[in-house]
Regions:
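Short, solvent-exposed loop/turn and secondary-structure capping segments
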Residues: 30-32, 38-43, 108-110, 141-143, ...
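Aromatic- and acidic-residue-enriched carbohydrate-binding clefts of CAZyme catalytic domains
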Residues: 1-9, 13, 37-67
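Aromatic-lined substrate-binding rim segments of carbohydrate-active enzymes
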Residues: 1-40, 117-122, 126
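Active-site neighborhood of glycoside hydrolase catalytic domains
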Residues: 67-148
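Hydrophobic faces of well-ordered beta-strands that scaffold small-molecule active sites
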Residues: 27-31, 95-99, 129-131, 151-153, ...
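Residue-level marker for beta-strand->alpha-helix junctions and adjacent short loops that shape enzyme
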Residues: 32-34, 104, 136, 158
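Amphipathic, non-transmembrane alpha-helical secondary structure
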Residues: 7-14, 18, 73, 77-81, ...
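Glycoside hydrolase catalytic-domain groove-lining segments
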Residues: 138-169
Length: 169
C-alpha cells in the first residue's frame, strides 16, 4: 500500500532490500496486488476505486478485469524494475514472492492467477512464487495455482490441524 500511495508515484523500496541484504537477511516478499485483509483494501491503493476516473469505471478487483489487470501490470513492472537486483537469481536476498493472499476465500479465477504469474515471469522474477490460502478444500483449491506456484496454508490458531491438512495435499 505504501509502495504507491498515488498512481505513478513510487517509494524507494529498493533501499529496504539493499539494507536487508547488507545485514544478511533473506526476504519473502508479498508484492500483491492483494497482500492481506488486515490492511485497508488488502493493500490495494485507494485510488483504484476513484469513481471520477473514467478509465477506472467498471474496475473489478482481484479478477481478470482489463482495467484492474493493466494497473496491476503497471505497478508490478515498476516495482520489479526497482528490486530486480535483489532477486536470488541475481545474487540478491529475495527468495520467495507471494502472488496472491487467501484468494480462495474471495474467488477462483485461474485466468487471473495465470496472468499475475505471467507478469511476474515477464519481469524476470527469479524467486519461488507461492500462494497462501486457508486449510479448507474449497479455499485451497480455489486459490492455489500449483502449475506455477507453491501452495502454502494459513493455520490461524489451528496449527496441528493445518499441518495435518498440508501433508494431505
Amino acid at each position: 500500500k505504501y509502495q504507491q500511495l498515488r498512481e505513478g508515484a513510487y517509494s524507494d523500496i529498493a533501499e529496504f532490500f539493499r539494507l536487508a541484504r547488507e545485514l544478511g537477511l533473506l526476504a519473502i516478499v508479498r508484492p500483491g496486488p492483494f497482500i492481506c485483509a488486515e490492511w485497508e483494501g488488502g493493500g490495494l491503493p485507494a485510488w483504484l476505486k476513484n469513481d471520477f476516473d473514467e478509465e477506472l469505471k467498471g474496475l473489478q478487483l482481484r479478477c481478470d478485469n482489463p482495467p484492474f489487470m493493466s494497473r496491476c501490470e503497471k505497478y508490478l513492472t515498476a516495482l520489479f524494475s526497482e528490486i530486480r537486483p535483489y532477486f536470488l537469481g541475481n545474487g540478491g536476498n529475495i527468495v520467495m514472492m507471494q502472488v496472491e493472499n487467501e484468494y480462495g476465500s474471495y474467488g477462483n479465477d485461474k485466468v487471473y492467477l495465470k496472468k499475475l504469474v505471467d507478469i511476474y515471469r515477464k519481469n524476470g522474477v527469479d524467486a519461488v512464487l507461492f500462494t497462501t490460502d486457508g486449510g479448507g478444500d474449497a479455499t485451497v483449491f480455489a486459490g492455489n495455482f500449483p502449475e506455477e506456484c507453491l501452495t502454502t496454508l494459513t493455520f490461524g490458531s489451528g496449527v496441528k490441524k493445518g499441518m495435518n491438512r498440508l501433508t494431505q495435499l
